[in-house]
Amino acid sequence: MLIAGLVLVGIAQHGLFILSHDAAHYRLFAQRGLNDALGRLIGMSSGVSMCTYRVTHRLHHNNLYGPEDPDTAIHGGYPRGVGYLWRKLAGDLAGLNAWKTYAYFFGAPALNEDTQRAIRPLDDTSPQLRADARQDRLLVVVFHAAAPFVAWALAGTSGMLAWFGLWLLPMVTVLQPILRLRAICEHGAVTDLASPLTAARTNRTWGSAANWIGRFVLFPHHVNYHLEHHLYPAVPHYRLPALHRLLVAKGALDGAEVRDLPDTLRRVFSPRPPRMNPGS
């Protein structure tokens, strides 16, 4: 029961992150103040600075797979070999990589492995957004520093143990491989980086048991419609299914990266292709 509880809490924390992602796009609520207040709170609960992520995520959208994309370090280069991703996910589940995840969400420089250049997302934004991000990071730190003391004040030792075991522990273990695998399913092992229709992927969450399980674990709040999200990032998550149907009806997704989840997983877990020798 304890393990099942940890898994379910980690899945729920991922769902909260997806909502904070919508808030980062100003799409959680039309009223911007409410959008940002709730987006900050939702992100804060799982250790994410929504305002910092807003800056970082803009670079991902504007420079997908380009030299300024801070997310390439996460999803780029796949397939990387059968064992590579399993080792990464095992390290995530063991909590070994959580510090890297939260460094990313706090705007730490990301290393582009192709150019060996550090991408500094917080240098490429307005003074106001930079100030908002700085304030938000401070609030996230205060929130998580205060949480165990609040839990103790409310329920003593049992409260602190509940906070640690049923919130902090799944946040640094179960949540981590979910974040990685979902990001790789969205962009890993795509067919053509030059086209917006093939550099991002929509994963079907209908039509088979495997797809439905993927919806529950990896793709809450319609985040599986990632190709459509990259084409039209101003569309809120609850409109993405209708957008997908419209684009399919018009033939706009012919040849696009739209796959069943098992097909995506086969691709990202495939053996690394042989390296081409220069001039060959």
Summary of predicted features, one role per range:
Residues 1-18, 37-51, 172-176, 210-220:
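Membrane-embedded alpha-helical segments that form the functional core of polytopic membrane enzymes
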Residues 8-20, 49, 53, 97-101, ...:
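Transmembrane alpha-helical segments that form the membrane-embedded catalytic/substrate-channel core
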Residues 1-10, 44-165, 237-280:
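Non-catalytic, topology-defining segments of multipass membrane proteins
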Residues 190-194, 231, 242, 248-250:
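Polar-ligand-bearing catalytic/cofactor-coordination segments
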Residues 32, 36-42, 193-207:
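Membrane-cytosol interface motif
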Residues 16-25, 53-65, 182-189, 219-235:
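Histidine-centered catalytic micro-motifs
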Residues 114-186, 190, 195-196, 200, ...:
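C-terminal membrane-associated helical module and adjoining short loops/tails
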Residues 19-37, 65-76:
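Aspartate-rich (DDxxD/NDxxD/DxxxD) Mg2+/diphosphate-binding motifs
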